[in-house]
Amino acid sequence: MSEFSNVTVVKEANIFFDGGVTSRTIIFSSGSKKTLGIMMPGEYVFNTAGAELMEILSGDLEVQIAGIDSWKPVKGGESFEVPASSSFRMKVKTVTDYCCSFLA
């Protein structure tokens, strides 16, 4: 899906790591949320409360999910899931466009 209809967009940006990662929150009529954002090259660690699906729209990175020793390469058009109450590390190699879905 390349666009979302009938949504509310929160104007204030979510800014992490001194602007290295930014996003905007989108709220659907069902109450579900996604964020659309950009990551600049760098290394980042995020914690999750609920499970998340990270769709990489463009860019190039490696991800390591907590409890898994190996790093997984992820490129534009690919995705990865992170379980609830976990964390993940990313080595972002190029400017990366992403959509994060917060799973129920």
Swiss-Prot record:
Keywords: Glycosyltransferase, Transferase. GO terms for molecular function: guanosine phosphorylase activity; purine-nucleoside phosphorylase activity; thymidine phosphorylase activity; uridine phosphorylase activity. Catalyzes the phosphorolysis of diverse nucleosides, yielding D-ribose 1-phosphate and the respective free bases. Can use uridine, adenosine, guanosine, cytidine, thymidine, inosine and xanthosine as substrates. Also catalyzes the reverse reactions. Belongs to the nucleoside phosphorylase PpnP family. SUPFAM superfamilies: RmlC-like cupins. It comes from Geotalea daltonii (strain DSM 22248 / JCM 15807 / FRC-32). It is an enzyme of class 2 (transferase). One of its GO terms (cellular component) is cytosol. It catalyses: a purine D-ribonucleoside + phosphate = a purine nucleobase + alpha-D-ribose 1-phosphate; adenosine + phosphate = alpha-D-ribose 1-phosphate + adenine; cytidine + phosphate = cytosine + alpha-D-ribose 1-phosphate; guanosine + phosphate = alpha-D-ribose 1-phosphate + guanine. The gene is ppnP. Signal peptide: none annotated. The keyword Glycosyltransferase applies. It comes from the Bacteria. This is Pyrimidine/purine nucleoside phosphorylase. Its EC number is 2.4.2.1, 2.4.2.2.
